[in-house]
């Protein structure tokens, strides 16, 4: 793969253990590709899509993803921090047990994403869409959730102590825990 790729498509390709550090992509579509063990550190991606891709033991630290999609992709044992994501779509992705402490996921779509056991302590999830996300055992303590869209089960299954929330979310939290807030 070239150091800079634009307007290309890769389907079912294996990038296992490849050095893709400093890779630049623009509007590139990866479908069902395998990035197991690949080094994508210091890479920069704009408008690219990673559909149903596998990231296992992949290094993504110091990488930037702008307006990208990881629809249905799975991440396991990856080095992600520090990572910059700007309006990224993680719909249906699997980020279970991933370390995203202090990550800025503002304005990202995490609809129906598996965040089971994910460490999101002190992460910024402002205005993120977490509708339908599975968050059993997720650590969200101290995170900024203001303006985030979540389901009632989010409030009962994720550890949210010390999280920053807005008034509507505080009411939703109380209702999810069966509190009578009507007076």
Regions found by a protein language model. Name each.
Residues 1-183:
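Tandem repeat scaffolds
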């Amino acid at each position: 793969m070239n150091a800079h790729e634009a307007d290309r498509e890769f389907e079912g390709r294996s990038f296992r253990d490849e050095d893709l550090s400093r890779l630049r992509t623009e509007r590139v579509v990866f479908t069902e590709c395998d990035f197991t063990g690949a080094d994508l550190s210091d890479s920069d991606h704009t408008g690219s899509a990673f559909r149903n891709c596998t990231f296992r033991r992949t290094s993504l630290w110091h990488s930037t993803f702008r307006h990208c999609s990881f629809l249905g992709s799975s991440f396991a044992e990856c080095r992600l921090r520090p990572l910059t994501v700007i309006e990224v779509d993680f719909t249906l992705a699997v980020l279970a047990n991933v370390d995203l402490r202090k990550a800025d996921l503002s304005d990202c779509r995490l609809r129906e994403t598996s965040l089971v056991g994910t460490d999101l302590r002190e992460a910024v999830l402002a205005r993120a869409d977490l509708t339908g996300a599975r968050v059993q055992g997720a650590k969200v303590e101290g995170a900024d959730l203001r303006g985030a869209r979540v389901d009632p089960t989010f409030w009962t299954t994720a550890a949210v102590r010390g999280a920053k929330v807005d008034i509507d979310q505080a009411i939703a939290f109380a209702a999810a825990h069966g509190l009578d807030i009507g007076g």
